Amino acid sequence: MKIDGYTRMAAVIAKPIRHSISPFIHNQAYQLTATNVVYLAWEVEEEQVEQSLQQLRVLDMLGANISMPYKKKVLPFLDQVDGSAQLIGSVNTIVQKDGRLTGYNTDGLGFLKSLPKTFSIMNKKLVLLGAGGAATAIVVEAIRQGVGEIHLFVRPESLDKYQAIFAPLSETLDVSIVLHDLSSRDQLNTTIEGTDLLINATGLGMDGSSLPIPKDFIFPKGCLVADLAYFPAKTPFLQLAEEQGAKTLNGLGMLFHQAAVAFELMTDKTFPEEEVWQALKLEYPDYVLEK
């Protein structure tokens, strides 16, 4: 990668963030598309977020990606927020142009793009275990793509909190979003029947041992099973699903595709998907579910 007096910057902003693989993805894409930009990881404190965003303008940066815990905190400091990001209530991509900062959320589209090309969410039944993090973004994008039915399972103590989030969303988008108690086995067994896409968005399993469901849980036949985690590459949730013959995917594809959408928003160039994906698999083999 050539760096000279004309090189611009982009960054991912969060804390912690030095472990991120986003710099690898974006810098590979810049190199393959002859884009004179370097992408860095900025680990900043909460009280430095506004100042960091101001640097996007001052340094005429291409933009930035925002990771947890700052996806909501950046909203007041933006000049404009894309409609989908407004519905989701968080931003993971900021484009800087002529001193103006525009916020987007590419998480939901990134996840849907990571699904097998033979799978369409149109008129399908979607069930999510957990409603935090990227779950709202996935729900909004699934609705945009014509999902038929949405169910979310959350901890009983969080039901009221998420009801307050998803009820207005359901009304605005005119789609039924039903919340359930994750601790109720009867609700889970009844609701899971006929599910086309089941997503673990709880974070349980990143320790390599915990499960968001009972060990004797029976996955619906023909159901595509996803986990938003990508380390370990195969969580206990995905392992259990595979043992029952289900098709599975982890969260690496979502991370990759949300980065691809962000790259295109920032550069107005086509993301070199196949080349970067192959490079990513070689650089981070431990994150890849299918070798």
Regions found by a protein language model. Give the residues of each.
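Glycine-rich adenosine-cofactor-binding loop
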Residues: 14, 103-105, 115, 119, ...
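Adenosine-phosphate binding glycine-rich loop
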Residues: 224, 228-291
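Rossmann-like adenosine-cofactor binding region
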Residues: 176-248
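Conserved S-adenosyl-L-methionine
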Residues: 144-149, 244-247
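Short, conserved loop/helix-junction motifs that constitute active-site signature segments
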Residues: 3-4, 121-122, 144-146, 214-223
